């Protein structure tokens, strides 16, 4: 939803430029390219939103590229067999201590994948070729973090990029971005996050179970891997997808009464998390 708003603001600016008018969103440039990383298991509405964005981008001259970034497939293959990517699973020790795993999936399967695409495909670098001086911190990477996500706004460790967070600078929260997309573009959006993201509320998994049983089965399979296999290197904690630190199949209605909503013209809209 947040990144979708940022992309559509760029499209709106492109349309304004074609008409000889000033940019509607001065902090948002007309992007050379925007990138969506398909992590292998996305909620159905996410792919529909991406298709909508691609159509808008084609009509406005703002390209949107979809890159395959197989987080889901890699995790299924590697967990319990070799070192797997660190996803922020909820942890629980025998003594009751609770914590979370480090979150490396966004960097490894989104930011780094985009950086490689820019370096190899857009800038034409070859393997082992050193960066040209003009490319050292010579490119902006705009991220669709909303104003409620300021803690995620950090410098980019890649020597090519300077991170920018226009939605944060404009003070736009998730509700603002939803309203913008709905009012200007006519699309009702939900949050974009892989189906097995541990930051989902329990309501999300209940929604999948009732409306997208095939997707729910895939997520349950991951939860069973967390239960049945020992991570490498071994840990002294049990790992869970659910923030309640229960198996998804064991969640009860009371556990799932945690959906988050925001107001849109007097309506309560589920944010998709």
What is each residue range found by the language model?
Residues 1-273:
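Nucleotide-activated chemistry modules centered on ATP-dependent adenylation/adenylyltransferase
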């Amino acid at each position: 939803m947040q990144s979708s708003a940022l992309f559509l603001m760029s499209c709106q600016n492109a349309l304004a430029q074609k008409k000889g008018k000033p940019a509607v969103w001065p902090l948002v440039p007309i992007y050379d390219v925007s990138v969506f990383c398909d992590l292998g298991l996305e909620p159905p509405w996410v792919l529909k939103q991406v298709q909508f964005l691609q159509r808008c981008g084609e009509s406005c001259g703002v390209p949107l590229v979809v890159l395959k970034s197989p987080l889901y497939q890699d995790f299924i293959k590697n967990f319990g067999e070799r070192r797997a990517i660190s996803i922020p699973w909820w942890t629980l020790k025998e003594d009751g201590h609770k914590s979370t795993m480090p979150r490396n999936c966004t960097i490894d399967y989104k930011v780094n994948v985009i950086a490689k695409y820019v370096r190899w495909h857009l800038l034409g670098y070859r393997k082992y070729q050193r960066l040209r001086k003009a490319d050292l911190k010579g490119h902006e990477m705009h991220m669709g973090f909303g104003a409620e996500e300021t803690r995620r706004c950090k410098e980019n460790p890649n020597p090519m990029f300077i991170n920018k967070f226009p939605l944060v600078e404009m003070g736009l929260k998730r509700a603002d971005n939803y309203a913008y997309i709905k009012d200007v573009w006519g699309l009702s959006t939900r949050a974009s996050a892989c189906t097995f993201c541990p930051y989902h509320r329990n309501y999300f998994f209940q929604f999948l179970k009732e409306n997208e049983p095939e997707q729910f089965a895939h997520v349950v399979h991951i939860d069973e891997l967390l239960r049945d296999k020992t991570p490498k290197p071994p840990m002294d904690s049990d790992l869970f997808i659910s923030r309640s630190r229960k198996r998804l199949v064991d969640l009860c209605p009371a556990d799932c009464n945690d959906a988050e909503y925001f107001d849109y013209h007097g309506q309560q809209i589920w944010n998709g998390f």
